[in-house]
């Protein structure tokens, strides 16, 4: 599980599982993605901690078109996609979802505020979370007290940030007090 999560964490905004080239050609792949924020002008202005832009586009129309293009170059119509929330920011952008390949499941995020029937036009399932292969998929990272039975939480919401641990005892050994919690992996 840990080795898979490390490989996955190095991916771009999604990752697919594949066993062989034959399976990739003949069997559906599984993709995870999150925080597409279709239609969101503000996300084009978000900055990383180092001051660089989180997304390279200047406006949401340009961003949406390029993301749809990249999605459909990667995801085939029969592939399964778990979208871990914050799919669109406004109703106008909902229609963008009809252009996306894949059998899609939405794990609802804090910006997914529209009625269920508005999302069901584009997603086969709507969920609060999903358990898969001993991992829990969610939008917001789950509380660490609930993580024990899963081991790993694949989530969205944090964009370029990571879940950190604080340990006051580490400073007595000259180590940083905060460090990355490797049980969490942000898409």
Q: Model-derived features: where do they sit?
A:
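Aromatic (phenylalanine/tyrosine) cluster motif
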Residues: 12-17, 22
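Catalytic phosphate/metal-binding cores of nucleic-acid and nucleotide-processing enzymes, i.e., regions
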Residues: 22-187
């Amino acid at each position: 599980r840990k080795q898979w999560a490390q490989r996955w964490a190095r991916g771009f905004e999604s990752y697919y599982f594949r066993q062989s080239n034959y399976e990739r050609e003949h069997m559906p792949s599984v993709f995870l993605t999150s925080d597409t924020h279709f239609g969101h002008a503000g996300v084009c202005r978000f900055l990383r901690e180092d001051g660089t832009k989180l997304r390279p586009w200047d406006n949401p129309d340009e961003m949406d078109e390029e993301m749809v293009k990249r999605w459909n170059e990667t995801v085939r119509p029969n592939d399964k996609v778990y979208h871990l929330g914050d799919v669109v920011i406004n109703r106008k952008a909902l229609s963008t979802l009809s252009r996306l390949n894949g059998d899609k499941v939405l794990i609802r995020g804090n910006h997914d505020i529209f009625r269920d029937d508005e999302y069901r036009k584009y997603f086969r399932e709507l969920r609060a979370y999903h358990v898969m292969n001993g991992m829990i998929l969610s939008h917001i990272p789950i509380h660490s007290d609930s993580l024990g039975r899963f081991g790993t939480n694949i989530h969205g919401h944090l964009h370029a940030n990571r879940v950190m641990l604080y340990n006051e005892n580490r400073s007595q050994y000259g180590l940083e007090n905060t460090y990355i919690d490797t049980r969490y992996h942000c898409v």
